[in-house]
């Protein structure tokens, strides 16, 4: 099976963490709809919402305009959505885009010149207990049970989650992130690794046998930045752009 090529003009965006008072992702999507941003492909690297799953009615209803707009854009644009630790069980929302749950990540693509590219949200390679505890929190049984209780409590659980996540600090520095990235690339066989999740916005070129490149996409929620793919001298590069100052 041939790998999907990442096209020149593709756009990467990660960690928008959209909530009641954070609307940058909505503006970004509408800039695409209006034609002011014209991606050849759109890669959503997860945590696009502070919380969203198919089984949680409060969040599904709150973000329904986003869901409809993303699916509408997917009619004419290849959209690849990598579920994160804040947004999962999304497949039943969409007809026109490709969803990659955490169990399928990383997903391997390739550049236009044949270099392999592994893409993931980033919350993978977890310790055994943590991995399966988080998978349980994503089960249909657990989420439907919580949703049932939430309805009885007039959405107090969902509103509490929203309020707590809204206060969470998203702009932080991980001091030893180079070494964390170095350990992560050792788990990959691909030439280029692209992840979100860590909120660091760093690129590292490792002088290992594979000469791997690690790219951590900057947090859209903090920097309002997205990244456009360009090719030069048979190499891929991600060019940073900002939506600040762009009118929808």
Identify the meaning behind each predicted range.
Residues 3-9, 13, 18-112:
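Core catalytic region of metal-dependent phosphoesterases/phosphodiesterases
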Residues 14-17, 47-48, 85-87, 122-123, ...:
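Active-site metal-binding loops of divalent metal-dependent hydrolases
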Residues 23, 128-132, 247-248:
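A short, polar/proline- and glycine-enriched secondary-structure boundary/capping micro-motif
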Residues 51-73, 137-141, 167-193:
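N-terminal short leaders/motifs
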Residues 98-104, 114-118, 123, 128-134, ...:
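Conserved beta-sheet core of the metallophosphoesterase superfamily
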Residues 108-111, 222-223, 246-247:
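A short acidic, often aromatic-flanked loop/helix-cap motif at beta-alpha or helix-coil junctions
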Residues 119-180:
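Active-site-proximal loop/helix segment associated with metal-binding centers of metalloenzymes
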Residues 238-248:
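Short, solvent-exposed aromatic-acidic interface loops
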């Amino acid at each position: 099976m041939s790998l999907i090529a990442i096209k020149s003009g593709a756009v990467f965006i990660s960690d928008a963490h959209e909530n009641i008072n954070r609307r940058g992702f909505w503006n970004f999507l509408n800039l695409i709809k209006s034609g002011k941003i014209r991606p050849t492909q759109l890669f959503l690297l997860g945590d696009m919402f502070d919380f969203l799953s198919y089984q949680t009615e409060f969040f599904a209803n709150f973000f329904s305009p986003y869901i409809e707009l993303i699916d509408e854009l997917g009619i004419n644009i290849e959209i690849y959505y990598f579920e994160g630790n804040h947004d999962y069980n999304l497949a039943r929302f969409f007809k026109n885009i490709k969803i990659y749950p955490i169990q399928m990540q990383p997903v391997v693509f390739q550049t236009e010149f044949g270099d392999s590219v592994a893409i993931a949200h980033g919350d993978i390679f977890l310790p055994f207990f943590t991995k399966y505890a988080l998978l349980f929190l994503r089960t249909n049984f657990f989420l439907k049970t919580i949703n049932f209780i939430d309805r009885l409590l007039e959405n107090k659980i969902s509103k509490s989650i929203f309020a707590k996540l809204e206060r969470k600090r998203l702009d932080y520095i991980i001091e030893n992130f180079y070494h964390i990235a170095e350990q992560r690339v050792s788990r990959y066989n691909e030439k280029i690794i692209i992840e979100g999740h860590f909120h660091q916005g760093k690129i590292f070129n490792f002088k290992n046998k594979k000469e791997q490149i690690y790219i951590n996409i900057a947090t859209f929620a903090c920097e309002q930045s997205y990244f456009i793919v360009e090719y030069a001298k048979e190499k891929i590069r991600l060019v940073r752009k900002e939506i600040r100052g762009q009118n929808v």
